[in-house]
């Protein structure tokens, strides 16, 4: 059991830390402990920089400047764009040419709207340098239109044939031109803009609607370009990718952001809120544009849509995969806060408990022992000969050592008595207020609500108390999750300190995983099914590899070190999907995903999982 000692105690009079999403969480993974606490937030992402670092390379932006902050804040929309069927097929190079022709025709309407919007914005700017900068941006758009003319020639698009604007294109262009004309909620009507300063706001608002598109295309170009190799010299869309990954386009995107920052620097909080809303709306409309492109070909994404005829069995770890805090820290917090402070308050209690001060010291000792012994166990595993190729049997044997360690650690916890006297209602209340990783509960909710989808959700966890997990998911309206964890034993709703030990090691997890799948096979012996496992630690490694798709969320270094030692490959999910798409054809009969391949797919947010599995709402 990966357990953590709380680093900061809360007020003795309440379980305030457990009940408020705005307080400091006393948790750290034991083998990544730091002096500073983690802050619990309902919007805390798994990674604090733009949640792509283990999968997608984000172009650098200043996190201190407004454009950088907005890009980070609305990165979810960026993910839905890059994981769109259109974008995946384009990156893979097997997008049907007719689809690309239609896209180019629609994009021309976008660019013409950009050029007009820049023209209007330049008229509103009251600074000569700003006017010149906007004029330069307009020139870049005109150059891009010329590039589209070359695309027209390369792909035999009839430029004399009038191409109707689709609804997604129309929504964005109308939004952009309305913004550039000053028709913005919270802004004076165009005819009532009395001063040059007021007109300058319109220029800033226009940049707020343009910037996300520029940054998104710069990001897509860089990401697609990074996937090209020498063997892709004949990639049909290399010219498009080269354009948007070029230094010139990256500089143009940066110039747009810099100008937005300059124009907004003197704005009030309310005016900055308007820019944020415009930025978000532009990102949303871009997502809709990508998903509106008509595709008449099989695609890898979204996963669940393509496997709607199959049974789906989806597994997830809990601690630090679904949660921001480790459940052991929560249980330790409850134990310490509710423990008697002196002999007088201890008298008459149903179950004899340690004093709070003794309990704190005991938790400190258990934490120290766990940290030291865990590191020793991992190093012992890594001291064995490194595998030349994927060695599942060798990994299983090595993890038996870690399993023995985890069981012994649980023995020490039980024998110490630190889990005695916890009230079941306090545990459930803590679970209801437990902050989950941003986007986690949305994925589970969406899966359960999707019609014509035969899916099961299972949580496999080392957590000492399954009631805590069930309460956390129930609070999010996800009652259909099957929880496989350890359980406290209770006497009249008070914990005895004993644990019903069901899942306490990597081997136990793998056994539970296989048992669930075997039962599914026995029930539906003629029907195929797809298994997905989502985890973050060494304890999840066997299940991740056994699953048809193993997704690693913001993994610990121990997971990567141990996995790599036994020949496991860690591939960014988007890169893996593009490779799968290259092999995905009309004739593809079997699933592209198979367990025990030795490959795991890395993501750094649940939003990325959502984009891949479920697609755009």
From Swiss-Prot:
Q: Any stretches that span the bilayer, and where are they?
A: none
Instruction: Name the enzyme group at the top EC level.
Output: hydrolase
InterPro entries given in the database record: HAD-like_sf, HAD_sf, Haem_Oase-like_multi-hlx, Thiaminase-2/PQQC, Thiamine_Salvage_TenA
Q: What is its EC number?
A: 3.1.3.100, 3.5.99.2
In this chain, substrate is annotated as bound at 107, 217, 244
Q: Which reaction does it catalyse?
A: thiamine phosphate + H2O = thiamine + phosphate; 4-amino-5-aminomethyl-2-methylpyrimidine + H2O = 4-amino-5-hydroxymethyl-2-methylpyrimidine + NH4(+)
What does the annotation give as the result of altering residue 317 to A? Loss of phosphatase activity
What Pfam families does its record include?
TENA_THI-4
Transit peptide interval: 1-28
Task: Report the Gene3D superfamilies cross-referenced here.
Answer: HAD superfamily/HAD-like, Heme oxygenase-like
Give UniProt keywords alphabetically.
Cytoplasm, Hydrolase, Mitochondrion, Multifunctional enzyme, Transit peptide
Does this UniProt record's set of keywords contain Oxidoreductase? no
Instruction: Provide one Gene Ontology cellular component.
Output: cytosol
Q: Name one GO biological process term.
A: thiamine biosynthetic process
Where do the catalytic residues lie? Answer: 213, 286
Q: Domain of life, per the record? A: Eukaryota
* Record GO terms (molecular function): thiaminase activity; thiamine phosphate phosphatase activity
Among its keywords, does the record have NAD?
A: no
What does the further note read? Knockdown mutants show reductions in root length and shoot growth.
**Any idea what job this protein has?**
May be involved in the salvage of thiamine breakdown products. This protein has a haloacid dehalogenase family domain fused to its TenA domain. Phosphatase with the highest activity against thiamine monophosphate (ThMP) and, with a lower activity, against thiamine diphosphate (ThDP), flavin mononucleotide, inorganic pyrophosphate, CTP and dATP. Has a thiamine salvage hydrolase activity, but only against 4-amino-5-aminomethyl-2-methylpyrimidine (amino-HMP) and not against N-formylamino-HMP, desthiothiamine, thiamine, ThMP, and ThDP.
Return the similarity comment.
Answer: In the N-terminal section; belongs to the TenA family. In the C-terminal section; belongs to the HAD-like hydrolase superfamily.
Q: What is known of its domains?
A: The thiamine monophosphate phosphatase activity resides in the HAD domain (297-571), while the TenA domain (85-292) has thiamine salvage hydrolase activity.
Q: What is this protein called?
A: Bifunctional TH2 protein, mitochondrial
Which species?
Answer: Arabidopsis thaliana
Q: What is the lineage of its organism?
A: Eukaryota, Viridiplantae, Streptophyta, Embryophyta, Tracheophyta
């Amino acid at each position: 059991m990966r357990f953590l000692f709380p680093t900061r105690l809360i007020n003795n009079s309440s379980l305030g830390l457990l009940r408020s999403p705005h307080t400091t969480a006393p948790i750290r993974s034991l083998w990544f402990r730091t002096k500073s606490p983690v802050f619990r937030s309902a919007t805390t992402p798994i990674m604090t920089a733009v949640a792509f670092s283990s999968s997608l390379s984000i172009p650098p932006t200043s996190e201190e400047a407004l454009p950088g902050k907005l890009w980070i804040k609305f990165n979810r929309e960026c993910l839905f764009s890059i994981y769109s069927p259109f974008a995946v097929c384009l990156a893979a190079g097997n997008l049907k040419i007719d689809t690309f022709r239609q896209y180019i025709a629609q994009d021309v309407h976008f660019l013409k709207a950009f050029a007009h919007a820049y023209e209007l914005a330049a008229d509103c700017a009251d600074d000569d340098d700003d006017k010149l900068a906007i004029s330069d941006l307009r020139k870049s758009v005109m150059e891009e239109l010329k590039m589209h003319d070359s695309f027209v020639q390369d792909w035999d698009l009839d430029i004399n044939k009038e191409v109707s604007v689709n609804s997604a294109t129309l929504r964005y262009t109308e939004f952009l031109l309305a913004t550039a004309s000053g028709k913005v909620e919270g802004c004076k009507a165009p005819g009532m803009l009395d001063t040059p300063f007021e007109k300058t706001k319109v220029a800033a608002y226009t940049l707020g609607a343009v910037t996300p598109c520029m940054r998104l295309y710069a990001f897509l170009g860089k990401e697609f370009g990074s996937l090209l190799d020498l063997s892709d010299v004949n990639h049909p869309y290399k010219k498009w990718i080269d354009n948007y990954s070029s230094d010139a386009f990256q500089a143009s995107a940066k110039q747009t952001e810099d100008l937005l920052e300059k124009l907004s620097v003197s704005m009030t909080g309310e005016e900055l809120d308007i820019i944020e809303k415009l930025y978000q709306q532009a990102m949303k409309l871009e997502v809709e544009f990508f998903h509106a492109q008509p595709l008449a070909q099989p695609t890898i994404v979204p996963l669940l849509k393509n496997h709607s005829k199959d049974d789906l069995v989806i597994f997830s770890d809990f601690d630090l995969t679904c949660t921001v805090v480790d459940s052991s820290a929560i249980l330790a917090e409850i134990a310490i806060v509710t423990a008697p402070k002196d002999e007088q308050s201890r008298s008459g209690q149903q179950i004899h408990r340690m004093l709070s001060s003794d309990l704190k010291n005991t938790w400190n000792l258990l934490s120290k022992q766990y940290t030291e012994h865990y590191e020793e166990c991992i190093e012992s595993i890594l001291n064995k000969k490194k595998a030349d190729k994927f060695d599942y049997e060798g990994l299983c044997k090595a993890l038996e050592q870690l399993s023995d360690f985890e069981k012994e650690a649980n023995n020490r916890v039980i024998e110490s008595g630190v889990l005695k006297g916890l009230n079941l209602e306090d545990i459930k209340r803590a679970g209801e207020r437990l902050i989950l990783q941003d986007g986690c509960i949305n994925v589970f909710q969406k899966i359960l609500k999707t019609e014509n989808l035969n899916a099961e959700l299972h949580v496999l966890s080392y957590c000492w108390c399954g009631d805590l997990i069930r309460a956390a998911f129930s609070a999010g309206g996800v009652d259909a999750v099957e929880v496989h964890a350890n359980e406290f034993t209770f006497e009249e709703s008070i914990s005895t300190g004993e644990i019903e030990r069901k899942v306490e090691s990597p081997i136990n997890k793998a056994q539970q995983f296989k048992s669930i799948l075997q039962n599914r096979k026995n029930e539906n012996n003629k029907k195929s099914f797809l298994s997905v496992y989502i985890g973050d630690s060494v304890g999840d490694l066997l299940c991740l590899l056994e699953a048809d798709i193993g997704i690693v969320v913001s993994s610990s270094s121990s997971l990567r070190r141990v996995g790599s030692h036994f020949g496991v490959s860690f591939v960014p999910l988007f890169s893996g999907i593009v490779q799968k798409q290259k092999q995905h054809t009309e004739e593809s009969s079997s699933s592209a995903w198979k367990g025990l391949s030795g490959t795991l797919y890395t993501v750094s947010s649940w939003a990325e999982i959502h984009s891949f599995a479920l697609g755009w709402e």
